[in-house]
């Protein structure tokens, strides 16, 4: 029995449509979908095509393994002329000892090394709920949180003009 399950990877449990949806999300759809999710509290408000995409992605993510370990996400507003205002607005959402709910899908990395000069670096300590999607598509060390994930803001620090946020899953 053990040999039967040994060779099965997590991505083999996905339907073709779910795998296609995950690949599409990882390429370019993430920006469009996450923007819609940020601006609409209820998926029923989304256009039908996007609503179906979200349903398919939710289904795919539910089949992916949960990642256990520490994660990092970087946020960089350097390309914007109103960089400082954007940073200030972003940081107002992260108040120590408060809960923050992420309405969109949230991509994190298992490893440091991606844009370490970013304005904001977000760390999740001892993750258990993020979905490990690194086996899908390019060899990225990506973990994706499902919609409406809640985090407790453990600590925020401004060090040499860079912000560091430590979160713990709720």
Model-predicted regions and their roles:
Residues 1-170:
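Mono-ADP-ribosyltransferase
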């Amino acid at each position: 029995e053990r040999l039967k399950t040994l060779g099965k990877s997590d991505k083999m449990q996905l339907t073709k449509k779910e795998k296609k949806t995950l690949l599409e999300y990882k390429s370019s759809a993430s920006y469009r979908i996450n923007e819609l999710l940020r601006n609409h509290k209820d998926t029923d408000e989304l256009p039908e095509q996007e609503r179906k995409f979200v349903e398919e992605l939710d289904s795919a993510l539910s089949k992916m393994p949960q990642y256990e370990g520490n994660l990092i996400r970087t946020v960089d507003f350097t390309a914007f002329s109103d960089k400082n205002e954007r940073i200030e607005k972003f940081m107002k959402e992260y108040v120590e000892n408060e809960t923050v709910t992420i309405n969109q899908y949230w991509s994190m990395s298992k490893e440091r090394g991606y844009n370490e000069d970013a304005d904001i670096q977000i760390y999740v300590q001892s993750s258990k709920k993020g979905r490990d999607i690194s086996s899908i598509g390019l060899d990225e060390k990506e973990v994706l949180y499902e919609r409406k994930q809640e985090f407790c803001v453990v600590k925020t620090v401004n060090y040499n003009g860079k912000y560091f946020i430590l979160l713990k899953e709720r």
